[in-house]
Amino acid sequence: MPVENEFPRELPNHSLISSKSQMTLQSIWLFRYPVSSIVCVQFPTDFPKPVLALSARIAIDLGLFTHIVQKCPITSRSLAAITGAEELLITRILRLLSTAHFAEETSTGTWAPTPITKTMAKEEIAAGYRFICHMVVPALQSAPGYFQHHGYSCPTDAKDGLVQHALQTKKTSFEYIMSDPHLLKDFNLFMGNGMGARKSWLDWYPVQSNILDGADADPDKALIVDVGGGKGHDLIAFHKRYPNAGRLVLEDLPAAFDDLGQYSMVIEKVPHDFLAEAQPVKGAKAYLCHHILHDWPDNYCVRILEGISSAMTPGYSKLLLHEGIVPEKGVCQFQAMSDIATMACNGGMERTREQWRTLLHMAGLQLIRFWNSPDEGGDGIIEAAKV
């Protein structure tokens, strides 16, 4: 039975937590909870949520989740000795966090891990919290002043949005991230966290019929170009399933690349700025953009799409946009919050089908089909071709 003021509308109980993988927890707690704690303060009972998110950030900075996992059970006194923080402060922070199952108080001042504790102890989750607190939270906090100053209109300039208003910079969010090595490291860890428990697009998109069949057998011709693909997670997953399919090209800014390890021989890295440069790889069978366009206002998206279109072969090349497809009515909470978060971060947007159609038309591309993920609220594939 939920206890009053324990936020049963938002916080899953232990039975639900136990039935989910840790990667699902990462989605629930890193995306849904911290963003909702800032965006969805609607009722007096929601007041503690920002305090909970702040307490989680302090616990991450002190390494409390890691110590609880590694040395359980552990007392506040022992945590104070390890971290150098005041014992009373640690107790007060963990006392609040335990009400939301971030840790379990087994006896007075003694703490043991829960499934959430173990998830929060992961470095990629800690990186995500730091990133959100550094950029997303200040941007959302600045929203009232920003919109008042800009006539209550959505941002259309990636150099003059909520992040810029909050952090007093004229850099795009990505330029700002690139300028700070610590923030860049956190961002890359966070973005490299994968799909969680959601199915990969390779599970439900018809790869064989739509990409492999009819592909040019010339080994110099690219099969897939992953535009802005970061660490190459999509291409690595593709290669594991289709090891002899063809040439795979990973494109991004040099700072975003990582060592591909054993896959460096099968995935070709090409430095590319999709906002400033024409697409260098011509005539690929498929150009993949995974969570790229939702980060940018329409005018930037058109520039990105036009750059890709210039390299596409009509009647052969496909454009695959792996993005959220927001319903016109009845949007789920995760998609709605993601829409506000992307707007805050870089003037981006989660788009409806009609908005995707319009965007493709503006770039001179033809919509072929929407492919829906089987996951509720999951991303889809917007498939397009060059007219």
From Swiss-Prot:
Active site feature: H294 (proton acceptor)
What UniProt keywords apply to this chain's record, in alphabetical order?
Answer: Methyltransferase, S-adenosyl-L-methionine, Transferase
Give the matching InterPro entries. Answer: COMT-like, O_MeTrfase_dom, SAM-dependent_MTases_sf, WH-like_DNA-bd_sf, WH_DNA-bd_sf
The entry's S-adenosyl-L-methionine-binding residues are D252
> What pathway annotation does it carry?
Secondary metabolite biosynthesis; Alkaloid biosynthesis; Mycotoxin biosynthesis
Q: Which SUPFAM superfamilies match?
A: S-adenosyl-L-methionine-dependent methyltransferases, Winged helix' DNA-binding domain
A Pfam entry, by short name: Methyltransf_2
Report the enzyme's class at the first EC level.
transferase
Reply yes or no: does the keyword S-adenosyl-L-methionine apply: yes
Q: Where is the signal peptide?
A: none
Q: What's an example Gene Ontology biological process for this entry?
A: secondary metabolite biosynthetic process
Which regions form coiled coils? none
Q: Kindly give the Gene3D superfamilies that the UniProt entry links to this protein.
A: Vaccinia Virus protein VP39, Winged helix-like DNA-binding domain superfamily/Winged helix DNA-binding domain
Q: What is its EC number?
A: 2.1.1.-
The UniProt entry's sequence similarity note says: Belongs to the class I-like SAM-binding methyltransferase superfamily. Cation-independent O-methyltransferase family.
What is its biological role? O-methyltransferase; part of the gene cluster that mediates the biosynthesis of the aspoquinolone mycotoxins. The role of asqD within the aspoquinolone pathway has still to be determined. The first step of the pathway is catalyzed by the nonribosomal peptide synthetase asqK that condenses anthranilic acid and O-methyl-L-tyrosine to produce 4'-methoxycyclopeptin. 4'-methoxycyclopeptin is then converted to 4'-methoxydehydrocyclopeptin by the ketoglutarate-dependent dioxygenase asqJ. AsqJ also converts its first product 4'-methoxydehydrocyclopeptin to 4'-methoxycyclopenin.
Which PANTHER family does the record match to this protein? HYPOTHETICAL O-METHYLTRANSFERASE (EUROFUNG)-RELATED (PTHR43712:SF1), PUTATIVE (AFU_ORTHOLOGUE AFUA_4G14580)-RELATED (PTHR43712)
Q: What is this protein called?
A: O-methyltransferase asqD
